[in-house]
């Protein structure tokens, strides 16, 4: 039976993680390793300045006092004698669209699985209501990953519209869109009168063309975006070389 490692960034007690577990319960041997609290926005950070605690909970899940990437690292290297066959992260409470993936702990947990040699899927619900819909999508994809042999080190970012299953329009393979700059931080004062700051909402869609994840969700489709860890802007390599040549000759 396949070994499936589940994690998230909303925390080990999040409804989305429970929904993912319940949806995949018949698809393999499950192990859940997730942060002990909400770690949204943690991205790919690892805890390097202190030791981590891995705690077994009464429901069979494991909690870690660290980041989503920590959880997958420990889940792969510290919980099982054998490596998992697939890492699934989610179900996130809210979408991870466009350049959200640069900040997302949900995507980072899946990416850590990919970095450790496994195929991985990050799944997010673009809302907080129909987790059962996202769970059915996850179960379908995990079944397909088994029958069609999703290659090792594959990384899929999946976003699901927050609608009943019957209202899903289909599935689109998409590219990442991108957002404009985020809003300015919100300034507040604490009880002692000191100024504090809340990080503001993400920016508006700057690229939501028909082939993007934004457009797929807006039209009611599940969005599946294959991701890679190579952030090199290959089209700019020659431009930068020419710029340096001009600089050295000036």
Swiss-Prot record:
> Which keywords accompany this UniProt record?
Cytoplasm, Hydrolase, Metal-binding, Nucleotide-binding
How would you classify this enzyme at the top EC level? hydrolase
- InterPro entries annotated for this entry? SurE, SurE-like_Pase/nucleotidase, SurE-like_sf
List the catalytic activities from the record.
a ribonucleoside 5'-phosphate + H2O = a ribonucleoside + phosphate
Q: Name one GO cellular component term.
A: cytoplasm
Supply the EC number(s). Answer: 3.1.3.5
- What cofactor(s) does the depicted protein rely on? a divalent metal cation
Keyword match Transferase: no
Judging by the UniProt lineage, the source's domain of life is Bacteria
Cofactor binding mode and count: Binds 1 divalent metal cation per subunit.
Location(s), subcellular: Cytoplasm
Which Pfam families does UniProt cross-reference here? SurE
Molecular function per GO = 3'-nucleotidase activity; 5'-nucleotidase activity; exopolyphosphatase activity; metal ion binding; nucleotide binding
UniProt-annotated binding residues for a divalent metal cation: 9-10, 40, 92
Q: Which Gene3D superfamilies does the UniProt entry name for this protein? A: Survival protein SurE-like phosphatase/nucleotidase (3.40.1210.10)
Q: Which family does it belong to?
A: Belongs to the SurE nucleotidase family.
Q: Quote the function comment for this protein.
A: Nucleotidase that shows phosphatase activity on nucleoside 5'-monophosphates.
Protein name, entry field? 5'-nucleotidase SurE
């Amino acid at each position: 039976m396949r070994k499936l490692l589940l994690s998230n960034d909303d925390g080990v007690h999040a409804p989305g993680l429970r929904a993912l577990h319940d949806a995949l319960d018949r698809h393999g041997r499950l192990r859940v390793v997730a942060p002990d609290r909400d770690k949204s926005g943690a991205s790919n950070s690892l805890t390097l300045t202190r030791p981590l605690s891995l705690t077994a909970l009464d429901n069979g899940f494991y909690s870690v006092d660290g980041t989503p990437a920590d959880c997958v690292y420990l889940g792969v290297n510290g919980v099982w004698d054998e490596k998992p066959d697939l890492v699934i992260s989610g179900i996130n409470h809210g979408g991870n669209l466009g350049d959200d993936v640069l900040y997302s702990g949900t995507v980072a947990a899946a990416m850590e699985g990919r970095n450790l040699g496994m195929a991985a899927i990050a799944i997010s619900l673009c809302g907080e209501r129909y987790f059962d819909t996202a769970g059915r999508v996850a179960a379908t994809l995990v079944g397909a990953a088994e029958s069609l042999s999703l290659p090792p080190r594959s990384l899929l970012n999946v976003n699901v519209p927050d609608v009943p299953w019957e209202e899903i329009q289909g599935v689109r393979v998409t590219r990442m869109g991108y957002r404009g700059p985020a809003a300015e931080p919100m300034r507040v004062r604490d009880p002692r009168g000191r100024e504090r700051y809340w990080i503001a909402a993400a920016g508006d869609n700057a690229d939501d063309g028909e082939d993007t994840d934004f457009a797929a969700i807006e039209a009611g489709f599940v969005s599946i975006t294959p991701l890679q860890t190579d952030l090199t802007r290959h089209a700019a390599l020659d431009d930068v070389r020419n710029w340096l040549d001009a600089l050295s000759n000036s």
